[in-house]
Regions:
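Conserved N-terminal entry element of GNAT/NAT acetyltransferase domains
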Residues: 2-12
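Short, compact, well-ordered microdomains
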Residues: 79, 84-91, 95
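Conserved GNAT acetyl-CoA-binding A-motif
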Residues: 69-83
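A short, internal acetyl-CoA/4′-phosphopantetheine-binding micro-motif in the GNAT/acyltransferase core
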Residues: 48-55
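Conserved acetyl-CoA-binding loop-helix of GNAT-fold acetyltransferases
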Residues: 56-69
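A conserved beta-strand-loop-helix scaffold within acyl/acetyltransferase catalytic domains
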Residues: 12-19, 24-42
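Conserved catalytic-core motifs of GNAT/GCN5-like acyltransferases
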Residues: 96-108
């Protein structure tokens, strides 16, 4: 498979703690999950999942971009616990301004 987004009509289903990516048949092919902290001002991004048959198609990157766009539009912050999200930030550093790293505030 290529690293381009598949030529399907992707739909996104937003819930309070996750966003699902659905194919044109309504089947779940990807999901990002999170929980909220700081009086719902900070998303803690925990996981990114893509169906094995759809990996390598940029679906994870598209979902991550949509979620981070939502977070920045809401003027909220996020903690990237998910390794995919952290890797995504290396390629799309403009989203780092909304990233929050609690350990940066601790004194050692």
């Amino acid at each position: 498979m290529t690293h381009e987004t598949e030529a399907v009509n992707l739909k996104y289903e937003w819930r309070s703690t996750r966003v699902r990516c659905l194919d044109d048949q309504g089947q779940r092919i990807g999901e990002i999950g999170w929980h909220m902290i700081d009086d719902d001002q900070t998303y803690v991004i925990e996981r990114t999942w893509v169906d094995p048959n759809h990996r390598g198609t940029a679906i994870a990157a598209e979902m991550t971009k949509k979620l981070l766009d939502k977070i920045t539009t809401e003027n909220k912050k996020f903690i990237p616990l998910c390794s995919f999200t952290e890797h995504f930030l290396d390629k799309e550093p403009q989203y780092r301004k909304a990233a929050y790293y609690p350990h940066d505030e601790e004194e050692f």
